[in-house]
């Protein structure tokens, strides 16, 4: 009987230790919303101090910024530092500005990759709005915090340009990187379904809980059904887009970015912008986890 008690006690002790270990792992797992709020607070603090060096430390060494201005991606931490130095220079329209950022959605998509999306507003010292828009970013978790892998932030204001003053969308890059062809197919299908005004097939390019953060829609759209139901196509509009950069992140995740243009065939007006998206590879398909595209 004594042996039985000893065995029971040992078993209970092992179960208790196992449960404690599981609890500790859960407790130590990073919370996406908390990490995102902390990241945005650090970003805002550095911006409001006009501290380019501090801001650049929020990015990984190989991070990419896709923003409304300039009209090309900013690649790598050193280039990102220079971009912030330019933003805070006294020649910049954003000199001595301050920024307000809010988080709409934050998610963990793997053990070390996170996404976030929300809105931003940049104001002058008199609180006049200089620029406002939406953001949808991808982050890498390291040393207890997240850093930008991809910033894709775009202003709401629309700038239309005559056709002769717009750069023609060139062909997409070629790459032998893993799963690149699946991304290329996804982008081609996106263009086709928009131009065919096919909301059903367009929505199926997204994961079931996919996020759409685009300048043509009010707010940030969550979920495939909402993406489909919110599509409004205008007659005479023709979309084109390309891929200018791609990176496979492991764990069936990839980021890609590029340029887009939309032509009004009735007036000749062309609207241009950039996009930076997060994809999930499943079999032969690349599904959009998050689309983040906006105006130049």
Predicted regions located by residue number:
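Short beta-strand edge/turn micro-motifs at domain boundaries
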Residues: 130-165, 272-296
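Positively charged n-region of N-terminal signal peptides that target proteins for export
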Residues: 1-4
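Hydrophobic pocket/interface hotspot
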Residues: 43, 54-56, 63, 76, ...
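Short, low-complexity N-terminal intrinsically disordered segments enriched in polar/charged residues
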Residues: 17-53, 57, 157-200, 204
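Bacterial N-terminal signal peptides
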Residues: 7-14
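Surface-exposed, charged secondary-structure patches
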Residues: 79-125, 228-272
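A short gly/proline-enriched turn/hairpin at secondary-structure junctions
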Residues: 64-75, 90-93, 211-221, 234
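A mature extracytoplasmic/lumenal domain signature
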Residues: 59, 69, 118-120, 137, ...
């Amino acid at each position: 009987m004594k042996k039985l008690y000893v065995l029971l006690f040992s078993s209970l002790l092992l179960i208790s230790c196992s449960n404690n270990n599981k609890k500790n792992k859960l407790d130590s797992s990073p919370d996406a919303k908390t990490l995102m709020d902390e990241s945005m607070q650090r970003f805002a603090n550095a911006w409001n101090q006009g501290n380019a060096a501090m801001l650049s430390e929020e990015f990984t060494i190989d991070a990419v910024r896709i923003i409304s201005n300039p009209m090309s991606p900013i690649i790598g931490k050193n280039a990102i530092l220079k971009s912030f130095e330019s933003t805070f220079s006294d020649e910049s329209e954003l000199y001595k500005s301050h920024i307000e950022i809010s988080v709409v959605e934050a998610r963990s998509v793997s053990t070390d990759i996170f996404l976030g999306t929300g809105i931003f507003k940049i104001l002058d010292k008199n609180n006049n709005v200089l620029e406002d828009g939406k953001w949808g970013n991808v982050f890498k978790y390291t040393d207890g915090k997240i850093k930008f892998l991809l910033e894709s932030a775009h202003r709401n204001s629309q700038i239309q340009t005559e056709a002769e003053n717009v750069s023609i969308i060139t062909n997409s890059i070629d790459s032998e990187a893993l799963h690149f062809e699946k991304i290329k197919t996804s982008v081609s299908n996106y263009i086709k379904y928009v131009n065919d005004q096919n909301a059903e097939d367009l929505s199926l390019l997204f994961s079931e809980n996919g996020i759409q953060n685009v300048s043509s829609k009010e707010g940030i759209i969550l979920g495939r059904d909402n993406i489909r139901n919110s599509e409004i196509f205008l007659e005479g509009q023709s979309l084109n887009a390309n891929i200018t950069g791609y990176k496979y992140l492991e764990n069936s995740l990839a980021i890609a970015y590029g340029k887009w243009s939309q032509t009004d065939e009735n007036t000749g007006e062309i609207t241009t912008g950039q996009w930076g998206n997060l994809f999930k590879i499943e079999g032969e398909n690349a599904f959009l986890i998050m689309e983040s595209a906006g105006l130049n």
